[in-house]
Swiss-Prot record:
The lineage of its organism: Eukaryota, Metazoa, Ecdysozoa, Arthropoda, Hexapoda. The gene is UK114. The keyword Chaperone applies. SUPFAM superfamilies: YjgF-like. PANTHER family: 2-IMINOBUTANOATE/2-IMINOPROPANOATE DEAMINASE RIDA, 2-IMINOBUTANOATE_2-IMINOPROPANOATE DEAMINASE. This is RutC family protein UK114.
């Protein structure tokens, strides 16, 4: 049986983890990106504003981590979005569809009681590396 290499991803181009975990882990050709918050990578503070601004920054952090893992938003197969208030669903979707604007990945969205650092939005994903072909089956 061959050994699968587990690569631990860390990039200075995204906010650092706020607890003991890696920004992402790559196993074989699959990238598991930890939850990204709307943190400024330099100050490690939540960006000013509300759910729209936090979602935008969280997605920028997610994109930076994906790039460090030799992947990208076009290779994301599953997103999970955590919201402090599900009433922010529409506002977050407006930001989300600017980043994921075609061939949408699978996605779940949950309202949660609390997020780290009192964030309003957290986004994690699973993506692929290497060459990826998309086919639509109906």
């Amino acid at each position: 049986m061959s050994t699968i290499v587990r690569k631990l991803i860390s990039t200075a181009n995204a906010a650092k983890p706020v607890a003991p975990y890696n920004q992402a882990v790559v196993a074989d050709r699959t990238v598991y990106v930890s939850g990204c918050l709307g943190l400024d990578k330099d100050t490690m503070k939540l960006v000013p504003g509300g759910p729209t601004e936090q979602a935008q920054k969280a997605l920028e952090n997610l994109e930076a981590v994906l790039k460090a893992a030799d992947s990208g938003v076009d290779k994301v197969i599953k997103n999970t979005v955590f919201l402090k208030d599900l009433n922010d669903f529409g506002a977050v979707n407006e930001v989300y569809k600017r980043v994921f604007n075609k061939d949408f990945p699978a996605r779940s969205c949950f309202q949660v009681a609390k997020l780290p650092m009192d964030a309003l939005v957290e986004i994690e994903c699973i993506a692929l590396t290497g060459s990826v072909e998309t086919k639509t089956v109906q």
